[in-house]
Amino acid sequence: MSDAGRELRALPVSGLPEIEAGANLGKTIAALAELRDGDLLVIAQKVVSKAEGRVIPLSSAIPGAEARRLAAVLGKEPALVQLILDQSSEVLRAERNVLITETHHGFVCANAGIDTSNLPEDGTVCLLPSDPDASARKLRAEITTAIAEEPGVGLAGHSPSAESHSRLLPTIAVVISDSFGRAWRLGQAEVAIGCAGLTPLDDWRGREDANGQKLEATMIAVADEAAAAADLVRSKDSRVPAVVVRGLDRFVTSDDGPGAGALRRPPQEDLFR
């Protein structure tokens, strides 16, 4: 089916407070977002990590010999290098002050995704969620529960009675996004590191293009493209970690789906390692 004429909207969710460890992030977002059936919520990784207690003191890491060696070569803080190694399954590149690793999740990125920006306390670092797909599933459940328990919460254009409320519960998707660099291009782009309730890949293999030619390899990274679209309406200093993306309801599913793990290329198909 042609996508001609379809509209995509990205709506920032404003007003989120500073999130602390143990917070019910899904409930907090549900109280502020106006959601419709088929909406997709893109949530920044950092706020998820904060809620999950993944912001830790840099001083908690005790550098080993390899961390000290790499730190001397790269000009990085030894404790930070140790944390990067702890969060990685393999070091792929270590040069020019850059440490590229494969994380335990299977992500290939700089510094194992560890970040020091936009943190309320000095001397702390933010780790990626331990299991971003599980985090996305949990957030989706929290948001749905919050809407179910409080009539009117999180529903765009509705003030339902408690009796009719259950019939209005929206089916939504959640994407957890993070900024990744690209090996052959300058700049960073948001990608999906976790998702739930979404078809993350739109497989066009075997279909025909506009000229009737059979497509052999085309797979659209829906979750990544939604993450990137959401990032265009928030800035890194905006304190807006959540964005509603509307218009992708054809990819939103009733079940949690395969998650963003489906986007990772199998090692045996990787031409560059």
Which residues make up each language-model segment?
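N-terminal, positively charged regions that mediate nucleic acid binding
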Residues: D3-E66
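Intrinsically disordered, low-complexity terminal tails and inter-domain linkers enriched
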Residues: D3-G5, T145-T171
